[in-house]
Amino acid sequence: RNMEKKQAVVTSDTLTKEQIRELAAKSLAGIKNSYAPYSHFHVSAVLLCGNGAVYTGNNIENAAYTPSVCAERCAFFKAVSEEERDFAAIALCGGLKGVVKDYCAPCGVCRQVMREFCKPDFKIILVKSEEEWKIYTLSQLLPEGFGPENLE
């Protein structure tokens, strides 16, 4: 379990440049933990909870492909299994053979998982380096998303 508890409360609206830089650095450092022997495309994600807790995740591939999991879902599932339900942001990076050369966006399945647990203004930070990132909201990357309220 890779979790750090902090006292400060953070939301998507109060996220600071320093916090973003910290998430970017952790994402870049965590890429070495990816298990991608088939695609050789390594991905790392760092999820920031509203209470300041941080959960990491990596893509974990499987020879049968279907059981593989993306880094973003890995981080979310770790957090949710630890009773977290309030999320502020996620930073992610990825690259062939673990070398980050460009921005890496979440796949559609990961966007849908984020939609299950996050507000439309949830921040998704695509990391290229500690100083180069792009920030999107969930509603920008998944407009008109289907969520729990659609089933009420």
Q: What kind of region is each of these model predictions?
A:
Residues 56-150:
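Zn2+-dependent cytidine deaminase-like catalytic core
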Residues 40-49, 125:
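Short beta-strand scaffold segments in enzyme catalytic cores
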Residues 27, 45-46, 75, 79:
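Small-residue (primarily alanine) positions within well-ordered alpha-helices
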Residues 3-25, 129:
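Short, compositionally biased leader-like segments
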